[in-house]
Amino acid sequence: MGRTKARRKQASKADNFPSSATAPAPSTSAQAPPSVTVEALLVQSAQRIAALDYDGAKKLCFQAVQLANRELQEKGDGADPRMLRDALEILGTVELELGDITEAKEHFAASIQLASATPDPSPAPHLYLAQLSDTPQESLTHFGNALGILQAKLAALERAKLGVDGGAGTQEELEDEGEIRRSASRALVGMTELYLTDLCFEPEAEQNCEKYLKQAAELDPSDPEVYQTLASVRLSQQREEDAKQALHKGWEIWRNVEVDSPIYPPRPSRLTCAKLFLELSEHVPALEILNRLENEDDEDSEVWYLSGWAWWLLGEARGDKPRAEDEESKEECWSEAKLCLENYLRLEERDPTGSDPEQMSHVKELMGKLDAAGIVASNGAEGEDGGWEDASDEDAMEQ
């Protein structure tokens, strides 16, 4: 269970957030040509987003908002506000990517206000605002509103399948049923997490956790985050064996799938999964997840800290007991631990801003114990040809 020294860093994205209103006044320097349509501007902004040109996408979204707002005012009563609603929602997502949180919240709120006058409101602004809310009660309200919209969409799809109301629900909506179920499941998971944390002292907290996760599992039994969150609930109830069972069930869903699969959880969720495995003394699966996270981004100091701690704990658990042929000895585990902790210290030395004092103190304590035991840091894992891989070797192969 070694590692390679080959590393790559992924571009950061806002993936951790889910997929009478007057539009906020856009910049007057971003006037749209008269022949351009709102839809065309939004298509162009989507192309800029795909190219990670968020500044360019924001300018196009501003133009779309301005044009849609002007058209809405010109048409007066009976005008369709959906284009403006969609433009505001897309603008908010772009602003999230740029870190403009206050502006994003304003535009999501404006989109929601417009959506109240449409027959097909979008759940996305509510899901975003649930993550950005200032209070747990506000967050819970947004999750609940998003869930209501998603449940209405699912009900419309069911009626369409049965032909009850003459074809409610388009073919595209029918094909998107899995995505709708996943979004509803994630809303319920979000509500559960609120009752596990900020609202944990509410008298109905435990009951709501059980209720929401049961609903989520019924909506989308293939969502690994349902079982991961259930593991957290079981841990809070001191039911460790049940927690292990739930966590392994969730992990097995995505363990062997490709990273571009819709089932594959986002990075923060996988990091939480690793932490839960560590809390349950399940060191080997924790290290498997952490090693993947290292390979995705070798500049995440928290991952190096957790990897070092996991290897240390695994070495302690192995001790001097007889081991299987393919198992690392205590000394080998601790050698890996020292490599990880040295990487942590290098990153913290390079950029100490935001450093966690407790984490740093723990790392120094572990390093002192490893030094006292005469442990030398591992060199990494051997490549297939028996040599050591490094970043320059991989770069040369890709050229």
Predicted regions and their residues:
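Alpha-helical segment of the N-proximal tetratricopeptide repeat
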Residues: 36-70, 97, 189-201
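Amphipathic alpha-helical repeat scaffolds of TPR domains
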Residues: 36-43, 81-93, 119-137, 178-199, ...
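Structural motif corresponding to the intra-repeat A-B loop/turn of tetratricopeptide repeats
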Residues: 51, 98, 133-136, 198, ...
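Residue register within tetratricopeptide repeats
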Residues: 55, 102, 137-140, 203, ...
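Amphipathic alpha-helical segments of tetratricopeptide repeats
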Residues: 65-68, 72-73, 112-113, 147-155, ...
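Short coil turns that delineate tetratricopeptide repeat
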Residues: 69, 82, 116-120, 151, ...
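Solenoidal tandem-repeat scaffolds enriched in leucines and small polar residues
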Residues: 138-253
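Structured C-terminal portions of repeat-based eukaryotic scaffold domains
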Residues: 241-377, 397
